[in-house]
């Protein structure tokens, strides 16, 4: 406990490039741990329970994750930008941001639930149940809050906090699953949701405690609520546009695969795509850490960019090599057909870590220097080009064509980002 307290109570000292790298490692490790533990959760659920129960629960969890992407509204990114500009008011800004996060998540979840029983049944089955709807609302709030807390930890230079919260989430979710299995072998779909709710509560409680002991006492008098809210929303919405432009292809490509090649092909594509995104989280997390460092110092430091790039390439490159080597084994866990159809796809997608590193460093610098709309344009063009190229090549060559189309767009974006980043650093 003493060691854990030391992790979260180090005084808030804004950081040079080496601390940016340390924070990036914590963020990347936390996000990767979250996805890895989530994979194990679903693997265990598939072993313990019927496909109907697992499928219905997965539909609701996927719907929740979609809601969290919209419900963030860039609030966490706004904190990364605004905290360095409002010294002495960090505690106040974080409090206001978290309250807005709760309100926004509830609003998005209610809108989603209000879409109608037909759509929701397609997403998860038994969502018409009031209990399932209530659990869904809680999951959306906790899931969105946890994402904003991750970004807040980056703003404070405390990447280790992210790892602690995500490991706690995974452990509690696993214990909840085992508890449900001990009680009954034939639970209702809504029962598994409570394992996620319990995990979300644990992660958020830990996060609140971390911020309580980490954030310095407020100084400089009482902060105007309207001013804080205006700064958070003004900065946040611009960052949200970039985030949505960047993440939209992850949601669109599986849908396109179904339309072009059919559901069977998508069954092989989706696990390969998710494995690739575990890798992509590494440069994305490091880019977020660079964003925090640039926003703090209000200038682009070559040493910070070089350190972040080196960290991303070392960790992401090592992980990519590991995935390339173990691709067949990883997919074989799901079944022989998955390994046969998806091994080459995973290997090609894994190579995307290298050009994506340049793109994410560029995005991080753009976020930190108020060049949001420039980066948003690049992300939108890259995403549209990636989906278009993947669709054209996929229709002719199947899943490997989808992978080649996506990789080509990522590589082109990486080249542009490298050139543009070089120009920005020379100014």
Could you tell me what each predicted segment is?
Residues 20-40, 98, 102, 133-137, ...:
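Hydrophobic faces of transmembrane alpha-helices in multi-pass small-molecule transporters and flippases
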Residues 142-164, 296, 351-381:
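Membrane-interface junctions at transmembrane-helix termini in multi-pass inner-membrane proteins
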Residues 3-6, 18-76, 237-263, 379, ...:
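Signature of the first transmembrane helix
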Residues 56, 88-100, 301-310:
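Membrane-interface alpha-helices at helix entry/exit sites of multi-pass transporters
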Residues 130-134, 163-217, 381-388, 396-424:
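Hydrophobic alpha-helical transmembrane segments
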Residues 4-16, 188-195, 206-248, 296-299, ...:
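Interhelical loop/hinge segments that connect adjacent transmembrane helices in multipass membrane
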Residues 71-87, 272, 276-300, 365-368:
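Helix-loop junctions and terminal segments of transmembrane helices
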Residues 117-136, 263-264, 325-357:
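Interfacial segments at transmembrane-helix termini and the short loops linking adjacent helices
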């Amino acid at each position: 406990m003493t060691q854990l307290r030391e992790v979260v109570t180090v005084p808030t000292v804004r950081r040079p490039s080496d601390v940016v790298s340390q924070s990036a490692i914590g963020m990347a490790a936390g996000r990767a741990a979250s996805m890895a533990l989530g994979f194990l959760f679903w693997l265990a659920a598939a072993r313990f329970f019927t496909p109907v129960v697992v499928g219905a629960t997965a539909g609701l969890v996927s719907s929740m994750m979609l809601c969290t992407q919209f419900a963030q509204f860039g609030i966490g990114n706004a904190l990364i930008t605004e905290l360095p500009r409002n010294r002495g008011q960090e505690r106040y800004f974080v409090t206001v941001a978290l309250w807005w996060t709760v309100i926004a998540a509830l609003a998005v979840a209610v809108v989603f639930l209000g879409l109608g029983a037909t759509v929701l049944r397609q997403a998860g089955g038994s969502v018409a149940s009031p209990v399932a709807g209530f659990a869904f609302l809680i999951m959306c709030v906790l899931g969105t809050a946890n994402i904003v807390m991750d970004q807040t930890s980056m703003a404070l230079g405390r990447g280790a906090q992210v790892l602690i919260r995500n490991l706690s989430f995974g452990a509690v979710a696993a214990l909840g699953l085992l508890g449900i299995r001990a009680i009954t072998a034939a639970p209702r779909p809504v029962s598994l949701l409570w394992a996620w709710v319990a995990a979300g509560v644990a992660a958020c409680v830990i996060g609140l405690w971390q911020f309580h002991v980490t954030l310095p006492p407020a100084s400089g008098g009482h902060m105007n609520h309207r001013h804080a809210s205006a700064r958070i929303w003004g900065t946040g919405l611009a960052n949200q546009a970039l985030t949505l432009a960047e993440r939209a292809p992850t949601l669109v490509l599986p849908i396109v695969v179904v339309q072009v090649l059919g559901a069977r092909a998508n069954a092989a594509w989706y696990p390969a795509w998710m494995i690739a995104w575990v890798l992509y989280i590494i440069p994305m997390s490091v880019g977020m850490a660079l964003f925090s460092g640039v926003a703090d110092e209000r200038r682009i430091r070559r040493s910070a960019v070089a350190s972040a790039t080196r960290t991303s390439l070392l960790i992401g490159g090592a992980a990519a090599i590991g995935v390339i080597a173990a691709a067949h084994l990883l997919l074989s866990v799901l079944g022989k057909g998955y390994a046969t159809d998806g091994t080459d796809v995973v290997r090609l997608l894994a190579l995307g870590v290298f050009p994506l590193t340049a793109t994410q460093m560029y995005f991080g610098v753009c976020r930190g220097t108020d060049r949001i709309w420039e980066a948003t344009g690049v992300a939108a063009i890259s995403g549209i080009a990636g989906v278009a190229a993947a669709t054209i090549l996929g229709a002719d060559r199947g899943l490997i064509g989808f992978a080649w189309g996506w990789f080509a767009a990522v590589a082109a974006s990486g080249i542009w980002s490298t050139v543009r980043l070089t120009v920005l650093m020379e100014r």
